[in-house]
A protein has these predicted regions:
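Membrane-embedded alpha-helical signal segments
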Residues: 1-302, 312, 316, 436-518
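Generic detector of multi-pass transmembrane helix bundles and their immediately adjacent loops
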Residues: 302, 315-501, 505, 516-518
Length: 518
């Protein structure tokens, strides 16, 4: 409802005709219908609802029939007691009732009774809870979020059965009035971060919120940053694990993607599978992901710089192969690499947006036919194609950073083709300076490495055993840092000293641990 065209202070009276006239003037859309019926003693009643998103059968069975069979009610409380529907709210003003009607919850008006009753008969067509295509799990839970915020909140509540789980409900969007939920664990998440996130969402001035990515734009401290500033996930088990560490979740109705804040860069090098395998295997996997990211970013630029400025850096045997491949290439190494990277991005974009059966054929054509034909025609060299292929594949070991890595990779190729190895070193220094100075709601983006937080290293690129994860990450600044107390020698009935300290909050161990970390 356009609040500029209606009077927010207009309130309902006891005359049903006057109330209906106000609603029709405020909601002139053709899909806003009125279901009129009579209660006991011939009292006129009406339910104003939005066609298509209101369950009309439920409206008739649980509202109209009980009122028709009962004596005429005189107050809203009497009307509420006669209804067979549990979800009933009161609305005194036109603005509140209009928003509920447009959300799918009809407003019930009874002649002689002041105000309206909002009935929770919203009809929503939902897809089933299923495994998200972007986060296929080999081991572990396979549930994923869907587009209904209430269902997503229920998936979180089912895993965190505690009164400490809190939800802050907001409506964002001038026209969409999208429901947005801020979820956190009271006593675990940082209060300052919660207030800052809530303030930014409340201050968002936007027409509509089709997806949670629109909310992420308002939560970003540096909107034009190359690197994302909020974590994302489609799986409730991953979200709950992050909330148990002290992070805050943001859900938006209509979006299966949840945002997590504060965000640290090391999150993207972690996988849900790391917690279902041994610490050694998880550590090796994380190091391999970091190595793959370095290969994806630096390999094309180093190839260009070595050809243009430092050809002697290439081993002699490899130099013979490379020189034979590039001898008749009309393009310079920098332009050749830039051209191949652009073709790679075009193929990726086309395969993502095409139907699956077309995308597979497109990938084969792009990888085999175009590559082989380009080499035979002498447009590009075979070593360059191999390097671009390795760089492209390596980027997908960290799917959430693929877009960022593509941009950074192109930047490195440009500076390598312009000023050689010195450009690579200079750009690397600038990126490190930028990442070190960036933060997400008081948490450094490169934590726990810059600044160095020893205890938090136990679950960064290195995955320690469960016993070493007795406290929550210090970087997240939560007050209650204790999350694990191991009881040893239980069979003998003896409990060893708990590493988390005494007391329910583990304050003694927290203080000792902070001194040790410092």
């Amino acid at each position: 409802m356009d609040t500029k065209q209606t009077d927010k202070q207009a309130t309902f009276g006891a005359d049903i005709r006057a109330n209906l006239r106000m609603l029709k003037e405020a909601l002139p859309a053709e899909d806003i219908l009125v279901y009129e019926f009579t209660a006991g003693d011939g009292i006129a009643c009406a339910a104003v609802y939005a066609d298509g998103i209101t369950d009309k059968e439920l409206l008739g069975a649980l509202v109209a029939r009980p009122l028709a069979a009962a004596p005429a009610p005189k107050t809203r409380e009497e009307v509420r007691r006669k209804l067979l529907f549990p979800e009933v709210k009161e609305a005194d003003d036109l603005d509140a009732a209009g928003k509920e009607i447009l959300a799918g919850n009809p407003a019930l008006l009874v002649d002689g009774v002041r105000g309206a009753l909002i009935l929770g008969t919203k009809k929503v067509s939902l897809r089933a809870v299923a495994e998200p295509q972007t986060a296929i799990a080999i081991k572990g839970p396979r549930e994923g979020f869907i587009e209904d915020i209430k269902t997503n909140m229920g998936l979180i509540r089912r895993r965190l059965k505690t009164p400490a789980l809190r939800f802050i409900m907001l409506n964002v969007g001038k026209y969409s009035q999208t429901a947005v939920a801020i979820a956190y664990l009271d006593g675990v998440a940082d209060k300052k971060a919660i207030r800052a996130i809530e303030a930014r969402i409340r201050a968002a001035d936007i027409d509509g919120v089709p997806d949670s990515s629109y909310i992420a734009r308002f939560l970003a401290r540096r909107p034009l940053s190359l690197f994302k500033q909020a974590g994302t996930t489609e799986k409730p088990d991953i979200l709950c694990a992050k909330m148990l560490e002290g992070r805050i979740a943001v859900l938006a109705d209509g979006s299966p993607i949840a945002l997590t804040l504060p965000y640290m860069l090391t999150e993207d090098f972690q996988s849900a599978q790391d917690y279902f395998v041994s610490p050694y295997r998880a550590t090796v996997s994380r190091i391999l992901r970091l190595f793959a990211v370095c290969v994806s970013v630096f390999l094309p630029a180093l190839y260009v710089a070595a050809q243009l400025f430092r050809l002697r850096l290439i081993p002699f045997g490899l130099l013979i192969i490379v020189s034979g491949g590039i001898r008749s290439i009309p393009l310079s190494p920098g332009l050749e690499m830039f051209f191949l990277l652009a073709v790679l991005e075009i193929l990726v974009e086309a395969s993502v947006r095409m139907p699956k059966y077309v995308a597979l054929a497109l990938s084969v054509i792009g990888a085999l036919v175009l590559g082989d034909t380009a080499v035979k025609a002498g447009l590009v060299s075979s070593p360059a194609i191999i390097i671009v292929a390795i760089a492209g594949i390596s980027a997908y070991t960290v799917p959430d950073l693929t877009g960022t890595l593509s941009l950074v990779r192109i930047l490195y190729v440009v500076v390598a083709g312009s000023i050689g190895p010195y450009g690579i070193v200079l750009l690397t220094a600038l990126l490190i300076w930028y990442l070190v100075s960036a933060e997400s709601y008081g948490v450094p983006l490169l934590a726990p490495f810059a600044p160095l937080i020893r205890h938090d290293l136990a679950d960064s690129l290195y995955k320690a055993d469960l016993a070493a994860l007795d406290r929550r990450p210090r970087a997240l600044r939560g007050k209650n840092r204790t999350r694990l107390k191991l009881r040893r020698d239980a069979a003998a009935g003896r409990e060893d000293e708990q590493p988390s300290g005494e007391g329910p909050d583990g304050q003694a161990a927290d203080a000792a641990g902070e001194e040790k970390d410092a």
